[in-house]
Amino acid sequence: MSRRRWGVAALAVGALSASLASAPANADVETNGHHGYSKTRTVGYFIQWGVYDRNFRVKNLVDSGAAARLTHLNYAFGFLDEAGKCVSADPWADWQMPHTAEQSVSGKADEAGQVLLGNLNQLKQLKAKYPKLKVNISLGGWTGSRYFSNAALTAESRAAHVKSCTDMWIKGDLPGLPAGAAKGVFDGIDLDWEWPSSPGNPTPPNVIRPEDKQNFTLLLAEYRKQMGWNRDLTAFLPADPAQIDRGFEVRKVFSYLTFGTLQGYDYHGAWDPEANQQSALRVPKGDPAQFEFSSEVTVDAWLSRGAPRSKAVLGVPFYGRGWDGVAPGKRNGLFGTGVPAPAKYEAGYEDFHRIKAKLSEPGNSYKIYRDERAGFAWIYDGKTWWTYDDATEMKRKARYINSRRLGGAMVWSLDGDTPQGELIKALDGALK
C-alpha cells in the first residue's frame, strides 16, 4: 500500500506559549561540501515492509549502485503509540528477521544467538561499507501519523516523545534486547507527520487539534533541545499550499530543520476520476482538476513562505499511477475518465520497474508520450493509462532542481527502481 497519498479531495480548505530555543547561525549542519558531499543531497526512502512481497532488502541498494549515490537514507517507518511515544511498526522486520549470506550486505549469514538481526543490522552493515552515508529513522507516514498530535500537545508530552524516540532509535535501546543493541544504526530523525491539523489517513484518521500547527514547531524545538545541532532533523512536507498554511509555521520550522523534503508526487491518483499527471513539473494545459498541483506550485509555495532554497529538497517518485478504461480523446488518454488500473500491490499504483516491463510484454500496444512543457510522461495502449517518471523525466527533474538552486532530490521509494538502478543513476548523475 502506498504510504504517501494525501487525499486532496478530502481536505477542506495563537501565539507560542513558550519562547523557542534559538538556532545557531550555522543551523544547517550539513551544507554542500560538509561530511564529504560535493553537491546537492540525494535522499532515498527504504521501506521496512519491502522485505516481504517485494523481497527488496538493504543489500539491493548495494547491488543496484544506489547506496553509493545516496547522501541520506531514510528508513520508513517507526510509529507512535497513543501516548505519543515511539514504537516499532514491525519488530520482526526491524531487528528480528535473520538474513542468509545471499541476503546480507556483508555476505555473511546471521548466526544463532546474534543480538541484532533484521533491517537494522543490515543498515549497520551498509554504513560500515559506506561510512559517508547518513541513515535516519522516519517516524509516522500516511498510516503512522495518528498520534503525532498527542505527542506534540504539551511540554511534558513533547519531552517524553523525544526521549522515547531518541532512546529507541538513536541510543538503540530496543525492546527485548540489551541496552544499546542498535546504537549507531541511525544518525538522525525524519518526521513524517502527515499532516498537522489534517485527518490524513481516513482509516483511522489522525487525532487533530487546532494548535497542531504551533505544536509542530515546539516539537522541533524539543528535538533540538535533546539532540543538539549535530544530528539531522528533517521532515517530509506537503505539496498542497492550503495544507502548508494549515499546518506549518514555515520560517520557524525551517530554522530547526537540517532540510525538508517537499512532496513532489501524488498530485493526482485513484481518488480522481480523470487520468492525470501525478508528478509533473508544471500544471499541464487544459487540466480539468479543481485544484492545480505541480512541483513548481509546491516549490513556489514553500519558498514564498520563507523556506530557504538550500534546505528545500524536492521529492520524486519511483512509481506511477494509472487508470483503466480510458478513451483516447484528443490527447492520448490524458484527462480521460477511468477507474484505478489493476496493479500488483494496490489498484492504480505500480512500481516503476513493473511499468517499464509492460513496454516489453509480448503483444503489448503501449506507446510512450511526453508533455515537454509540463514535464511528465505516460504510457497508453488505448485503454490503460499510466503516468510515471522514467530516466528521461528524472534528468528533467534534476535540471529543474539545479536551475532553482534547491537543496537536492528525495526518492519515494528506492524499491521501485530497476535492479540496475536506472532511475537513481539518471537522477543523481544530473544533479549538481
Language-model segment annotations:
Residues 1-27:
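Secretory targeting and sorting signals
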Residues 29-175:
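Glycan-recognition patch characteristic of GH18 chitinases/ENGases
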Residues 33-37, 120-134, 140, 216-234, ...:
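Surface-exposed amphipathic alpha-helices with a cationic face
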Residues 51, 356-432:
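Extracellular low-complexity, Gly/Ser/Thr-rich intrinsically disordered linkers
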Residues 73, 137, 191, 260, ...:
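Conserved, mostly hydrophobic/aromatic
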Residues 85-107, 196-352:
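Substrate-binding surface in catalytic domains of secreted glycosidases
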Residues 154-189, 219-227, 245-259:
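An active-site-proximal structural segment forming one wall of the substrate-binding cleft
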Residues 169-210, 266:
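Active-site groove signature of glycoside hydrolases
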